[in-house]
Amino acid sequence: MKINTALSFDGGGMKGLFSAYFMKYFCRDAGIPGNQIYKYFNIIAGTSIGGIQALAYASGYSPDDMIELFLAQQNPLNNGSNNPSSIFYPPVSTLQKINTILYGDQTWYQNTNLKALLNAKFGQSKMFQLKTNVLIPSVEIYTTQVPDVGTDVKAYRPVLYSNIKFRGLEGQNYLVQDVALSTSAAPIYFPAVNIPEVTTPDSKFIDGGVFQNNPAALSWAYNNAINPSANRTCILSVGTGLGTIGLFDPVPVPPPESVRKYLNEFRNFLLLHKNYTTEKTEEIVNSILPDFENVYLLLDLISLGISGPQEAINKILELLSLYGTKINNQDLFYYRFNTIYDLNEDTELDTTNADFLNYIQTAAEQQYQQDAIKIQ
C-alpha cells in the first residue's frame, strides 16, 4: 500500500510552543528521532511560526531545538522588557499598541532580532536543499495599475512557497531564512519583507496567516497531486491552541472600565508630558473614546477572520476522515492536536513571560494525555 503522509503546523506566535511540546511527546512515544522527523512525512506544511517550525524540521532540527528557541524569548524579570535578544524587544505598552493601531503607521516590533535568529538557524541554505517537501503560505503585496485608469493601487496575492516544482508553487531557489521571515511577518507586529529574487515593483510579503493559518488542507491537496497513485493519505495537523487575540486583556470583549483604564493612562500622559490643560486633555480623551472602544471590536474581528477558516478546514478534514470519504480512491486518516485555552489566561501572540510559557507546557501535556488513545 502506498501512503502519503503530511505534517501541518498552524500559526500562533509564541503559542507555537504548544506545537513544539506536542512534537516532543509524539516523537518520544513513536520512537522517532527528533532530528529525523523529515524522514516520516512526504510534506511538512506550516504558516507563520508554524512555517518556521516546518522549515526547521525539514532541515533536521528537533522539537527540543524549537522549545529552546521559544524559551530563549523569555525575559528574566517576567515583564517582557529585559531580554534584548527577544524577537519582541523592545517591549510595547498597551498605550503604544492602541496608539499604533489607531494613528500610527509603524509596526509594534522591528524584525532585526527575528532576522538574526533565522539566519543563525538556516544560514545560506536554500529551499531545494531541504530534506523533505515543504509547503509554506504567505501573501504578496505589490503595486499594480488599474486598466484604462492609470491609477496605481495595492494588490494582494496568496503565495505558496515550496521546494517542489509543481504548478502554483514557487520559491525553490529562495533562501530558507527569507521564506521563514516572509511567512511570519504578521501585520501590526512586524514589517512586511522583501525577497531579493522577486522583482515585482514594490513587492513585499506578509504573514501567511492572512491567507491560510491552517495549511492542513493544502498539504493534503498537493500531496495527492504529487503522489496520485497512493492508496491512503495520513495527515497530522498541529494547532497552537484557541484563545484570545485581544492584545490588551484576557477577556475577549473587555468591560468599559478596562477601556477607561487605558484612557486614564493616556490622560496622565497628556497632562505630564504634553503640558496640556485639564480642559484640553479632557477634550482630547473624550474625542478618542469611541476609537479606543472600537479597537477591541476590530481585534475580535481579526481573531475571527483567522481562527474561523482555520477551524473550518479542521472540521472538513475531520468529517471526510470520519465518514471514510474516498477522493481519487484514497482513504483519508486525519488527526488534529489542539486545545482551547482558559479565556482568563493571557495568550497573546507576543506574550513571553515565564507564567505564560509554563501554562503552555502544561496545556500541551494535558491535551496530549487526553488524546492518548487517538494519538496511538
What are these regions (language model features)?
Residues 1-376:
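Conserved catalytic cores and adjacent C-terminal regulatory segments
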